[in-house]
Amino acid sequence: MTSIDRLARTGIDLCISEIINGKFAVHFDSTYVKDGCLLVGEFGRGDTVEEAAADYIEKLQGKTIVVNPSSKNRREILFL
């Protein structure tokens, strides 16, 4: 299973952007990482979309992500 497949299986919309120098950034839409009492944005970067997805997975590993934090549909998920 590729990193993109793993992220897609969460059911959370995935945003993929081309950034400076032809590199790519990947992140979940409307999703933040819980850091104590703060919510921080996180994204993966890489030379390819797959590398960016793998970087994002590494950054989320073992952390609580918060989906739609300011809505009634807010969800907190431990990313394993």
Go through each PLM region and give its residues.
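A short, charged, amphipathic alpha-helix used as a generic interaction element across diverse proteins
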Residues: 45-63
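Assembly/interface hotspot detector across virion components, adhesins/toxins, and nucleic-acid enzymes
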Residues: 17, 31, 65-67
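Short N-terminal "domain-start" leader segments
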Residues: 1-25
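A short, exposed loop/beta-hairpin motif centered on an aromatic-Gly-Thr core
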Residues: 31-51
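Short, charged, surface-exposed hinge/linker loops at domain edges
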Residues: 2-5, 60-80
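Short acidic, gly/pro-rich beta-turn/loop elements at beta-sheet edges
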Residues: 36, 54, 68
